[in-house]
């Protein structure tokens, strides 16, 4: 690594952000399988996109079709999966985008490691705190049934622990209220911290 140096681009993050008229940020949605992470992140992205924001949604299942298709579900592979996603998200934020990432990301250490790569104002942890009982009842992919039967090992929430965030910027239980209200809470927060400026906030009203 001693012969590898960081190449400084002539166009920096600030210039890209100014061109897009937005403040780049990473929203990291974490929670159990079936908690509603992808649904919530997708609905927020749609709202932001329609209001003129430049966005991208990184989804836990989708990245395993390409970027992380060589990885399994051992502890080491899960760590590497999130490390790669964190690096990609950082590049996207540097490109001036509003990035939404929906991953179980079960340990605080994993999430804190990704947080540490970003300025304080550019990492927002969203804990989708839907209870296990609700997630298991939903079971959209049939994974809890397989985990309970022993067909899937090391399944978060059943045979592997989930460490809830201690100080997430936002906590949303998708079993309470409706999706519109939940997305509104996210938009209000982003407006309060000036990720969404006053002009674009009107388009989201």
From Swiss-Prot:
The keyword Isomerase does not apply. It is an enzyme of class 2 (transferase). ATP binds at residues 31-38. The active site is at 105 (phosphoserine intermediate). InterPro entries: APS_kinase, P-loop_NTPase. Its EC number is 2.7.1.25. Disulfide bonds: none annotated. GO terms for molecular function: adenylylsulfate kinase activity; ATP binding. It catalyses: adenosine 5'-phosphosulfate + ATP = 3'-phosphoadenylyl sulfate + ADP + H(+). Pathway: Sulfur metabolism; hydrogen sulfide biosynthesis; sulfite from sulfate: step 2/3. Keywords: ATP-binding, Kinase, Nucleotide-binding, Phosphoprotein, Transferase. The keyword Secreted does not apply. One of its GO terms (biological process) is hydrogen sulfide biosynthetic process. Transmembrane segments: none annotated. Catalyzes the synthesis of activated sulfate. Belongs to the APS kinase family. NCBIfam families: apsK, PRK03846.1. This is Adenylyl-sulfate kinase. It comes from Shewanella baltica (strain OS195).
